Amino acid sequence: MAPAIGIDLGTTYSCVGIFRDDRIEIIANEQGNRNTPSFVAFTDTERLIGDAAKNQVAMNPQTVFEAKRLIGRKFADPEVQADMKHFPFKITDKGGNPKIQVEFRGEGKHFTPEGISSMFRRKKREIAESYLGGTVNNAVVTVPAYFNDSQRQVTKDAGLIAGLNVLRIINEPTAAAIAYGLDKKAEGERNVLILDLGGGTFDVSLLTIEEGIFEVKSTAGDTHFGGEDFDNRLVNHFVNEFKRKHKKDLSSNARALRRLRTACERAKRTLSSAAQTSIEIDSLYEGIDFYTSITRARFEELCQDLFRSTMDPVERVLRDAKIDKSSVHEIVLVGGSTRIPRIQKLVSDFFNGKEPNKSINPDEAVAYGAAVQAAILSGDSTSKSTNEILLLDVAPLSVGIETAGGVMTPLIKRNTTIPTKKSETFSTFADNQPGVLIQVFEGERARTKENNLLGKFELTGIPPAPGVPQIEVTFDVDANGIMNVSALEKGIGKTNKIVITNDKGRLSKEEIERMLAEAEKYKAEDEAEASRISAKNGLESYAYSLRNTISDSKVDEKLDASDKEKLKTEIDKTVSWLDENQTATKEEFEAQQKELESVANPIMMKFYGAGGAPGAGFPGAGGPGGFPGAGVGGAHSGGDDGPTVEEVD
């Protein structure tokens, strides 16, 4: 059985683990460290990843870090604009998306955040392969619980670029809960609160654990808050102190800021175990040495508003789960920033003096849980402890569609257990409207303009009638938290669907190929995999389009019964083959498609020869995927300039 690893790709540090022989092994890197810095550096001669990259960050402005803060975001996002002030590397705007600009081997290069992320993943994969002595293809990857749909999609993309088959994306606090609960044999249901405060993200989740069932009740957090924000407060404090003492402003000098930031991070860590620490940096700026000190009390004062804000998501998860804080049996702290004594005290005080559980390593807990889930999903049935685990996670944000007047109509509410599927019926807004624009949003606000647009698609060819068409919209959220949305016009069976992929934010094939070429590894394999997936998707789309076509009543009444049965048998055979051969080669998928076409084409030609209308929906007769006129240039679809559907009471 091929091994599957668990990867925790943190904002500042990453960790990889494997579950085998009934125990977890956190895999050390080539430096012997169990956590690897999430840094990648570019020089005139090479690319450095991990410890080697972080060790030269003060000298090399071409060192990229905190790429996770940019994942799935737009260049114009306030968070991205704020981060740019602290980064030594340049962020540029390409099509509304942030690109990281560096000098590599004497040339200017642009990387996407997911491209940088894939380099860390490939590094963790190589560390695991070196340790295990074999190839590793499968992984469970963790994300902050509050990552939205597009951030999850981009995370999956980064796994693909790294040559990994991402078995599942799981939420970081949920993974930590597995780490906590794996060996717990307590009888009865226990309410466990996981507080995960890392370098750049913050999550709080409340779970109930009972006899191996881990059920997430609620989750809250901030995907842009963590230890780096505490570092920024220290950096700003010392920049002002330097200005006050020496009448010079070092904030415009990138190298001086990088050296100061490194010293501030070290000081922050020291203050978790000491009441005071000193900072000594020789020739920090214009030949001036900077020697100073800071106490834990002063650090806590600088960050007091940030520290206090960590309790807001805690209150929210308890409120959402309808659980009183006195009913929480255990509080588990995860992430390096939870080592800060003030945060531990705030948590303890909030829970009326209850001490947090410190039985698991806060730096390794997430990778630990991911490794357990990887073993389960890869079919490891050798362990009794993993055989008894069932994981029930939730959707972090409400998702729905825009209805008349720009109203957000949620179909799946936040904290709904996933995977889940929900359908609701709507009608057209205007009389004789030939099409509808389905716009999918994510968020908690009442107006769609205040929520996040995930994607949109059109459903056209609707019979003209005043408010009569019944359009069933279905949302299907998978176990990764990624969505499929479909719409069906019930009268004539017109259908269309979308996988919410945030296309504008994702990598094009050319960008993926360029990154693979620059990484100088596995280019041929990844290109072959992309075309294999394309062939698989093509066959799948063709088979299902054919199935929809012969189910159409207009086609059904004119199609010869024996022909229909023959075609149905061939389609069923193809779909069954697809289910059992997901890893087949491109040539095998193409051969299956030719075989299906050889049966379908003569039958459909005969049907059209007998007077069947091309508008009946034969695959390829119209728009993409066998939905005639559904794409650009089809019938008027209501346009982009206003809401086109309303809810049916």
Swiss-Prot record:
Induction: Preferentially expressed in yeast cells, the host parasitic phase (at protein level). GO terms for molecular function: ATP binding; ATP-dependent protein folding chaperone. Residues 614-649 are annotated as: Disordered. The keyword Nucleotide-binding applies. It comes from the Eukaryota. InterPro entries: ATPase_NBD (IPR043129), Heat_shock_70_CS (IPR018181), HSP70_C_sf (IPR029048), HSP70_peptide-bd_sf (IPR029047), Hsp_70_fam (IPR013126). Residues 614-641 have a biased composition (Gly residues). It holds the Pfam family HSP70. Keywords: ATP-binding, Chaperone, Nucleotide-binding, Stress response. Gene3D superfamilies: 1.20.1270.10, 3.30.30.30, 3.30.420.40, Actin, Chain A, domain 4, Substrate Binding Domain Of DNAk, Chain A, domain 1. Belongs to the heat shock protein 70 family. PANTHER family: HEAT SHOCK PROTEIN 70KDA. This is Heat shock 70 kDa protein 1. The lineage of its organism: Eukaryota, Fungi, Dikarya, Ascomycota, Pezizomycotina.
